[in-house]
Amino acid sequence: MSQIQNILASSSPRRKTLLKQIGLVFSVEKSTIIEDYNLKISPSQLAIFWAREKARSISVNNANSIVIGADTIVNYDNHVFGKPKNKNESMKMLRFLSGKTHQVITGVSINYKKLDMEHIFHSKTRVTFRNYNEEEIIEYIKVETPFDKAGSYGIQDSFAKHVKCINGCYYNVVGFPLSSFFYHFKNLHKEIKEHNGC
């Protein structure tokens, strides 16, 4: 698996940490794709679409490498939240999600342009928040950095105290569904070996 270079098309520190956690060797090349979450497709299709766009934008100049693209969104009843642009948007998101159960959806694309191979999938996790108040929202935004996180919160930081329960992959909520990724990553390598007659 180590003979082909891997590129993560994301500068997310959480994705980098998670991929290192499973021993993956990779470089980082941030995609310049700007997501538009107003497309008239389902939330799952939306996450997959932008993951593919990110991976493909990097694979154009890296055909011999495996490029990994990902996009995480928060969905509540087809209200889709990406990363907040500012403090007001962050507060608005957190107010909306208080006391509710929402979905965290991550789309992933694993692209090997040299052989026109691509594995795409998405992972969903249901997250239920307890009720929290305005003061707690303000304090969270003051102490943490929610502006690079879908839905404006990190389950791995101090906001964990407001998480009542989750149903599904924890790592997906952090930003990358490790187990599902590794399954597809291994299968892609198997397909490459079979194509090369190994």
Language-model features: locations:
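Anionic-ligand binding patches
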Residues: S2-N6, S42-C198
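Flexible, glycine-rich phosphate/dinucleotide-binding loops
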Residues: R15, E35-Y37, M117
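N-terminal beta1-alpha1 ligand-phosphate binding loop
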Residues: S2-L24
